[in-house]
Amino acid sequence: MATALASKLSKGRSLLGGLCNAFSGLMNSSSNGMMNGSILSQQQHRTFIQMGTILKCVDNSCAKEVMCIQSLRGKKGARLGDIIVGSVKEANPIVQKKVKKDAIPKGKVKKGMVVYGVVVRAAMPKGRADGSQVKFDDNAIVVVGIKEKKGQNNSHGSKRKMEYNQPTGTRVFGPVPHEMRLRKQLKILSLAQHIV
């Protein structure tokens, strides 16, 4: 009887603690003034990467912005290290003249193409084993494959199996979390400027 009562008491404390934290966060945000409108817009920023989310492309594959079409994770949205299918909404113009050794390859990805990408930065906090959390200011991906049109085969006549561990670009800009190592994305880690 005493153990059942103790477990119910601990559950009640954890629920009450979470409620108090949410309420204090609500009071702090309202007392500081509304920066970008309502509290709901701030809460929306911390959700999964789902269909319709605009992501920044942080490699040099000529894509600037990609809109998520589908998460290959399943019903839930994508998190750090997950693979998504996206449509390129904005792309860099193709560089015609060669200026030294530029970071931008000649037009691998164009606007309107459907690409596969690995989520390398997410605005939603992700807990780590040591108790800390990693959270980024933006949602970003690295392009790892370009979806071919239906019926398009490679030179051998058989359909090519898509490899999701080789990035299309040759550089990755900005920080990348070390959780990519657990997702077997070692090539992205080796190309990254900073590992967090």
UniProtKB/Swiss-Prot annotation:
Residues 1-62 form a transit peptide. Residues 148-175 are annotated as: Disordered. InterPro entries: Ribosomal_uL14, Ribosomal_uL14_CS, Ribosomal_uL14_sf. It is found in: Mitochondrion. It comes from the Eukaryota. Disruption phenotype: Female-sterility due to abnormal gynoecium and ovule growth and development with highly reduced integuments and collapsed cells in the distal regions of the ovule primordia. Slight reduction in the rate of growth and size of the pistil. GO terms for biological process: embryo sac development; integument development; plant ovule development; response to brassinosteroid; translation. Mostly expressed in pistils and inflorescences, including floral organs and meristems, and, to a lower extent, in leaves. Keywords: Mitochondrion, Ribonucleoprotein, Ribosomal protein, RNA-binding, rRNA-binding, Transit peptide. Pfam families: Ribosomal_L14. One of its GO terms (cellular component) is ribosome. Its main location: mitochondrion. GO terms for molecular function: rRNA binding; structural constituent of ribosome. Induction: By brassinosteroid (BR), repressed by the BR biosynthesis inhibitor brassinazole (BRZ). HAMAP family: Ribosomal_uL14 (MF_01367). Part of the mitochondrial 50S ribosomal subunit. Binds to 23S rRNA in mitochondrion. Required for the formation of the proximal region of the ovule primordium during floral organogenesis, thus participating in patterning and growth of ovule. Also regulates the initiation and/or maintenance of integument and embryo sac ontogenesis. Prevents inappropriate cell death in the young ovule. Belongs to the universal ribosomal protein uL14 family. This is Large ribosomal subunit protein uL14my. It comes from Arabidopsis thaliana (Mouse-ear cress).
